[in-house]
Amino acid sequence: WDPAVARRSMDQALTKLNNNVQGVVSSNDGNAGAAVAALAEQGMAGKVPVSGLDCTVQALQLILLDQMTQSVWRDFDMMAEATAKATVALINEDSLDGIVMGTSPANSAGKEVPMVPVGFYNAVGEAGVQYVIDNDPSITKADVCKGEAAATSFCKG
């Protein structure tokens, strides 16, 4: 979860694999951005698919710059509501039926973990960036259209 560690790991992977990397799947956009930076140093940014999670402003900018393929956006209000319902049920020692909708695969301890699924959207290209801007009150077009991204057709239009 630390972009500095992710960058170091990506640099090491590129060295060990002689730049023979076919794609990067990252658990968050900070680490995806670090992977893009490492790829850029090797002249590979935009040539290797990179995916992230969270649809941060940086990720949306990298998508517009064709350096990141996609990021997954989740509605934080929906996540907060599901968390609040589960928390209240646990505090009141009530059933989680109707809140928990299954289990995740077994974790490293061999135990399945109750799961509360939350809807998501795969933000790809300009349409994906626009979707996030339209649906996430914490991100504006003005935020995204700064720096290098300001020169993209999305930001100029």
Which residues does each predicted region cover?
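Short, well-structured alpha-helical segments in soluble
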Residues: 4-20
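Structured segments of extracytoplasmic/periplasmic soluble domains
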Residues: 12-16, 38-42, 62, 66, ...
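Hinge/cleft segment of the Venus flytrap/periplasmic-binding protein
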Residues: 82-157
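Venus flytrap/periplasmic-binding-protein-like
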Residues: 23-69
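Short, hydrophobic secondary-structure boundary micro-motifs
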Residues: 23, 71-72, 98-100
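Extracellular/periplasmic ligand-binding modules, especially the Venus flytrap/periplasmic-binding
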Residues: 28-36, 64, 74-95
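Hinge/beta->alpha junction and helix N-cap segments in small-molecule ligand-binding domains
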Residues: 1-9, 25-31, 54-58, 74-80
